[in-house]
C-alpha cells in the first residue's frame, strides 16, 4: 500500500539518461480511492504562490513578519539561523532543526501546538528546516517554503490549513539570492525538475506530480548505484543477506550522541552504575 501526499510515478516506462536509469515501474497498480481527481478538488485547502526571483534574508524575514502565525521552512540550518535572527521580537519566535536533540524537538513542537491554539498569544512565528515536512502534525494558516522539488513543496503545504480551519490557507515558495542558494546534488535536481514545469501548472494536481517525477527521473544516471539488482538476480544463488546490507531507503551516516538535556545525565549515571556501557 503506497500512500503519501506526494506520490511518485510508480507505473509505466520512464527513460533516464542511460539504460541503467530506465524506470519500468510496477504493473497492475489499483487506485483504492474512487474518483481520485474529484476528491482531490474537494480537499483543496491551500493556495500556492511561487516566486523564483532571488530574495535576500532581510527581504524574506520582512515578508514572513507580515503574518502573525506563520511557518517558514528552509533547506539548511544556516538559512534557518539567518532568518530566525532577522525576525522581530514582537511575539513568540521559535526555531526547529536537527541542531536540537530529539527531546528538545519534541518539547518545542508540543509548545508550538499549544501556542497556536492559545488565542491570547496572537504572534507565533516558526523557522524550521525540512524536518517538519514528514510526520510533524502542525497547522499554520500561512507557510513559506524555500525553493525545492515539488514533492517537498507539497509536503510543506501540508502544514498549511491542515485542519481546514479557514476557507483557504496560503503557501509561498521563495528563492534566496544566487549567492545564498547553494543547492547541490539531489536537491538541485529536484528543484530544476520543478522549474521545468509550466508556470501555470495546477501544482496540486496528480497529473502535475506525475510530470514532475518524469522530469526528475529523466535526469537520473541510475536507480541502482550499489548494483543491488545484481545480488537478487544471480543465476546460481539469491544473495538476500548481501542485498539487505547494501540497501538503504534513506542513507543514514549519523552517529548517536547523548547530550545533557533535562535528566539525561542522571539516567546515564544510573546506567554506568548498573555496569552498562554505551558506544
Question: Could you describe each region identified by the protein language model?
Answer:
Residues 5-64:
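Interdomain hinge/linker at the junction between the two RecA-like core domains of SF2 helicases
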Residues 136-140:
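Conserved ATPase-coupling elements of RecA-like P-loop NTPase cores
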Residues 58-67, 73, 78, 82-109, ...:
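C-terminal helicase lobe and adjacent C-terminal extensions/tails of nucleic-acid helicase motors
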Residues 3-7, 13, 74-77, 128-131, ...:
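A short beta-strand-to-loop transition that corresponds to the Sensor-1 phosphate-sensing loop
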Residues 14-23, 87, 142, 188-190:
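Short secondary-structure boundary/capping segments
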Residues 117-133, 145:
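Conserved two-lobed SF2 helicase motor
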Residues 1-2, 69, 122-125:
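Loop/turn-to-beta-strand initiation segments
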Amino acid at each position: 500500500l503506497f500512500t503519501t501526499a506526494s506520490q511518485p510515478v510508480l507505473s509505466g516506462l520512464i527513460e533516464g539518461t542511460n539504460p541503467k536509469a530506465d524506470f519500468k515501474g510496477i504493473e497492475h497498480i489499483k487506485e483504492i480511492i474512487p474518483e481520485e481527481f474529484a476528491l482531490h478538488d474537494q480537499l483543496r485547502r491551500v493556495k500556492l504562490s511561487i516566486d523564483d526571483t532571488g530574495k535576500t534574508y532581510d527581504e524574506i524575514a520582512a515578508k514572513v513578519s507580515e503574518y502573525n502565525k506563520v511557518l517558514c521552512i528552509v533547506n539548511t540550518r544556516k538559512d534557518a539561523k539567518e532568518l530566525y535572527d532577522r525576525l522581530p521580537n514582537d511575539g513568540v519566535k521559535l526555531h526547529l532543526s536537527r541542531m536540537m536533540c530529539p527531546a528538545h524537538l519534541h518539547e518545542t513542537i508540543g509548545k508550538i501546538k499549544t501556542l497556536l491554539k492559545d488565542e491570547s498569544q496572537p504572534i507565533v512565528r516558526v523557522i524550521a528546516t525540512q524536518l517538519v515536512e514528514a510526520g510533524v502534525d502542525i497547522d499554520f494558516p500561512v507557510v513559506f517554503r524555500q525553493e525545492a522539488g515539488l514533492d517537498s513543496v507539497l509536503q510543506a503545504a501540508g502544514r498549511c490549513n491542515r485542519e481546514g480551519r479557514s476557507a483557504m490557507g496560503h503557501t509561498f515558495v521563495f528563492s534566496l539570492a544566487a549567492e545564498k542558494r547553494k543547492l547541490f546534488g539531489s536537491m538541485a535536481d529536484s528543484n530544476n525538475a520543478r522549474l521545468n514545469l509550466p508556470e501555470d501548472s495546477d501544482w496540486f494536481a496528480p497529473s502535475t506530480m506525475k510530470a514532475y517525477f518524469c522530469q526528475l527521473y529523466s535526469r537520473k544516471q541510475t536507480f541502482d548505484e550499489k548494483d543491488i539488482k545484481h545480488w537478487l538476480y544471480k543465476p546460481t544463488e539469491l544473495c538476500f543477506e548481501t542485498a539487505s546490507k547494501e540497501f538503504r531507503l534513506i542513507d543514514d551516516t549519523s552517529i548517536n550522541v547523548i547530550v545533557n538535556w533535562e535528566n539525561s545525565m542522571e539516567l546515564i549515571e544510573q546506567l554506568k552504575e548498573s555496569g552498562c556501557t554505551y558506544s
